[in-house]
């Protein structure tokens, strides 16, 4: 488990469906409260296990123990390997302006600094600052090929974008079970559909190949076209993931930390260096997935009895995740890659959530911090 070898594209054949999230308030008549899209990696992992049950392209136990997936990202269909990832929160891109959060030295009249200490960098003596605090981000995605570039260079290269999908909410009739008529009471319910522009596709990363074909995917199980593309060691994402993180990283996938019962903003583990930790983030997002079927149901499936994935499995424990783009800054160099993060940093529910790509992160440079990264070697 040291690199992603396959890039999986998901191309809808029509509308897709996202989760309505944690709640739907009476005031929100368009049903967009907490709307959640694209589908989390739990959905793509489910595709692997269901496809393997039918096609048997890898040993089931090996797949369960070693499968690692991550995402969601997106790309143009004709350039899937030039996919887009969330912009780190320290970079703010609006329509005509941009800004960055930087670390500036705290002002202290009483502080007396010797010549020997003047050159030493100390996180506790710095604080977050930016020039235009009223500027709101209007773009949230950037090309992976432009990772770690300053906001002004992202603008110059036009390497940033808005999400290529739109939410479409409509009233859906509830049909009687015995006849094709709408039920008399509560016969309409609000449904959240998502329309992806036809030239774009969703992207997920994996260390196993998913056979090409048509699959049912996401909410309501609508048909999508799946294609797997080989990802070389020299691809930008693999080169970035091979670099050790020094003083800072940014999440490109939701971060689910904490214990099996509680969600935290960082790993609750003695090996995690949380002393002096500084985080730049937004409000937490709901995180949940379907666990799949039980051992008894596996035995039924193995006996070749009709298996319906819609009627099996149970939902995982509801958790909150740190949103993608969140920035973590450490007092001392972390000297780890994401692949080096121990499984114990992640909750476990049948398997550690690292296998679902939780907390996937890349090293970043922030003005005011010691240089964190070097350019990836070609």
What residues fall within each predicted segment?
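Conserved active-site/ligand-binding neighborhood in enzyme cores
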Residues: 2-378
């Amino acid at each position: 488990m040291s690199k992603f070898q396959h890039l999986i594209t998901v191309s809808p054949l029509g509308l897709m469906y996202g989760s309505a999230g944690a709640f739907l308030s009476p005031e929100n008549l368009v049903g967009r409260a907490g709307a959640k899209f694209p589908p989390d990696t739990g959905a793509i992992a489910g595709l692997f296990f269901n496809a393997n049950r039918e096609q048997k392209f890898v040993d089931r136990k090996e797949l369960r123990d070693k499968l690692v997936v991550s995402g969601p990202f997106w790309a143009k269909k004709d350039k899937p390997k030039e996919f887009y990832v969330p912009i780190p929160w320290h970079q703010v891109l609006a329509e005509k302006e941009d800004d960055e959060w930087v670390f500036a030295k705290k002002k202290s009249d009483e502080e007396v600094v010797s010549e020997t200490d003047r050159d030493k960098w100390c996180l506790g003596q710095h604080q977050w600052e930016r020039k235009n605090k009223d500027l709101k981000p209007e773009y949230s995605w950037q090309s992976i090929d432009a990772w770690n570039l300053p906001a002004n260079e992202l603008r110059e290269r036009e390497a940033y974008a808005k999400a290529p999908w739109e939410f479409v909410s409509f009233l859906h009739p509830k049909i009687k079970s015995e006849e094709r008529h709408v039920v008399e009471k509560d016969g309409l319910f609000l449904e959240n559909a998502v329309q992806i522009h036809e030239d774009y596709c969703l992207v997920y990363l994996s260390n196993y190949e998913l056979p090409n074909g048509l699959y049912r995917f996401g909410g309501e199980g609508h048909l999508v076209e799946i294609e797997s593309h080989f990802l070389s060691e020299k691809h930008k994402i693999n080169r970035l993931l091979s670099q050790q993180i020094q003083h800072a990283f940014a999440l490109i996938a939701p971060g689910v930390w904490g214990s099996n019962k509680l969600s935290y903003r960082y790993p609750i583990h003695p090996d995690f260096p949380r002393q002096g930790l500084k985080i730049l983030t937004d409000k937490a997002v709901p995180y949940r997935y379907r666990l799949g079927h039980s051992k008894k149901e596996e035995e039924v499936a193995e006996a070749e009895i009709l298996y319906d994935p819609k009627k099996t499995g149970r939902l995982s424990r509801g958790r909150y995740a740190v949103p993608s783009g969140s920035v973590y800054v450490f007092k001392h160099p972390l000297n780890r890659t994401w692949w080096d993060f121990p499984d114990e940093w992640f909750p476990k529910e049948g398997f550690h959530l690292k296998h679902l790509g939780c907390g996937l992160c890349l090293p970043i440079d922030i003005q005011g911090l010691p240089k964190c990264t070097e350019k990836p070697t070609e």
